[in-house]
């Protein structure tokens, strides 16, 4: 052990603490919460991909609902996958059938492999273009590995701001 080794140990980065459960996913858009069964797409409304809810956006920005890493970022820009802290797998899907827009109206701010923090801007969308294309713009947040958890519960209703509590995940 060298004389200055204690300095190296002191400056080593701290290991991030494991998240405590229940873990709360934040609202990823400004707007009005849409219950899962009212999402205008049967795959989401029936919970086939996992428990979810939507937000009918009033602004064209989508933010990270959880700390994690971007695992999916298709070129179309209409969806993102995040491996969140605590093993929570999140799919953010912007709009219904918006994949048909082939990226027009979507401006992703992240790419696959990027680390994100809750509240980081993930993408911008042109709500007018989405409406003109005839698609609902609802921002859908899905916990795709719902079955890995004891509970996944939507805790918000009415109007929400980005960062407000949206979904509670219990282990």
Show which residues each predicted segment covers:
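Contiguous, well-folded functional domains in the mature portion of proteins
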Residues: 2-171
């Amino acid at each position: 052990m060298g004389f200055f080794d204690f300095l190296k140990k002191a400056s080593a980065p701290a290991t991030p603490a494991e998240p405590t459960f229940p873990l709360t996913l934040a609202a990823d858009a400004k707007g009005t919460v849409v219950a899962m069964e009212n999402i205008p797409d049967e795959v989401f409304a029936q919970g086939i991909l996992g428990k979810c809810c939507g937000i009918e956006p009033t602004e064209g920005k989508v933010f990270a609902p959880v700390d994690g890493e971007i695992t999916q970022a298709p070129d179309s820009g209409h969806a993102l996958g995040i491996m969140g802290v605590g093993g929570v797998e999140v799919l953010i899907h912007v709009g219904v059938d918006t994949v048909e827009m082939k990226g027009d109206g979507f401006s992703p701010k992240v790419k696959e492999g990027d680390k994100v923090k809750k509240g980081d801007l993930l993408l911008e969308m042109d709500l007018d273009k989405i409406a003109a294309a005839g698609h609902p713009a609802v921002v859908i947040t899905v916990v795709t590995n719902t079955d890995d958890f004891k509970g996944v519960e939507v805790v918000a209703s009415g109007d929400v701001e980005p960062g407000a509590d949206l979904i509670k995940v219990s282990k």
